[in-house]
């Protein structure tokens, strides 16, 4: 399995794989604390990937990425985890890898053996990273919380099992957790947020926003909203609350399996009026707003 894998491997890539794998240098295998720093050009990309462990990212100064990882070996061995640092063009990739079984590139982590030995993967890892302002960031942990507070140009952040918290991003945000809360605050670009099992809370300066949860509440606040992009909010089991500017306009489609739908805005109803199903127009219409929940109330509120 590859974290953040997005490209199909082709025969030509496979033919050169042995040379690439053998060239990867795993560092810090026997060290309790590992540090690395790399310069990244303006607008460059920073990628931090880990099978497990908490990742805390903040804004640094200058044009250097500063990475520090601390191993807690009370329930495991120091040599379970090592690190691969790869500089490529105007970007850098840093991976925390299971030293005998992982490979690392710009798209993420990949296991060599295709098998997983859960019994000895018990070492806990805590990573802190300082990144230059304005970089593009991609980061993921297979099992751990991920926190980002930095004025990066855009961010793609995920956890397989942990909380995701993001604040201050100046552009697009893509945030997800397989099992944990997702919180995005003070974002000034489009936001896409997902949780398989947890609440999703978003506060943006400008929007638009799309959010979903398999089992959790969705709370979204947009102080401003430019453009006419469609938005969708859905929960399998939870309340959905969307706060929008007072000049908001949209074609609304809302459905609740078991709950009421309310709005602060005058709305022109289309079709049959129902407490759990709503079709109508707010303001001048335009963008499409879709909302749904299997079990919970839905609210469209006016920002104050």
What are these regions (language model features)?
Residues 1-304:
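Intrinsically disordered, low-complexity terminal regions
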